[in-house]
Amino acid sequence: MRQLFDEAGGGRGLLAVVAVVLLGGTAAAAADELKPYTATYNGIWHGMTVARSTLKLEQTGDTWTFSSRSEPRGIGRMASGVFPPLQVSVVRVTDKGVLPQSFKSSGGDAGKSVELNYDWQRHKVTGSYEGTRVDLPLTPRVQDDGSVQLGLMVELLQGHTPPNVQLIDKNSVREYQFTRDGEATIKTPMGDMHTVIFKSQKKYSPRITRFWCASDRGFIPVRVQQKRDDDVQWTLEIQSLSRQ
């Protein structure tokens, strides 16, 4: 999805779910609790199922690759900006925290492509974002559409409430605030799942994104939904989950 938090028409990417900041010395312990998995979701746009998305987390040492592949269904090509065909985020989880290394996204056409590279020695993130050159200072709070998801899971596995995040948007960053919003039992094809709900919102924005994270499945999101006032813009609903 594109523009997960605040843009009309959809999400920033299936990979992008909520905020993260660099963790302290407990991050490595949290990384031991992360587990590779594959999950599929139905992408629902204005009440219509328009995509099937596959989310995969893979590990090589302290490096994690988080990928999302979306296939259009029905009129899904109209919503390719909401559910991009491919997104790949590479991060390292170390005793210094969650460190994004690179991010790539194909948004359905060349003008929607994103490619970011992180240089932690120079504290710079560079690349291109939908045709805009990116050259930004790199701080622990800066994340991309993929690294935020791993940050969320690491925070929750440590029993922390995720903090605010600065998410890259072209050659700038936007700050989003989110809070815990209760608990709920969600019916899924795999059975009922207990979830913790978080909501995210940019200051003064009418859009709110909510995330239902399964507490007994490593806090993997089983539902994500964005609303503008009372109007549901889009929803992701989990269909299958295989976790190592």
Predicted regions and their residues:
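Bacterial N-terminal signal peptides
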Residues: 13-25
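Bacterial N-terminal signal peptides that target proteins for export
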Residues: 2-16
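Intrinsic disorder/low-complexity signal
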Residues: 5-6, 31, 143-144
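Small side chains
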Residues: 24-25, 43, 127
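Hydrophobic, well-structured mid-protein blocks that either form specific transmembrane helices
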Residues: 109-151
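Short, Φ-rich (hydrophobic/aromatic) sequence segments
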Residues: 21, 148-156
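Acidic, serine/threonine-rich low-complexity disordered tracts
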Residues: 31-120, 156-244
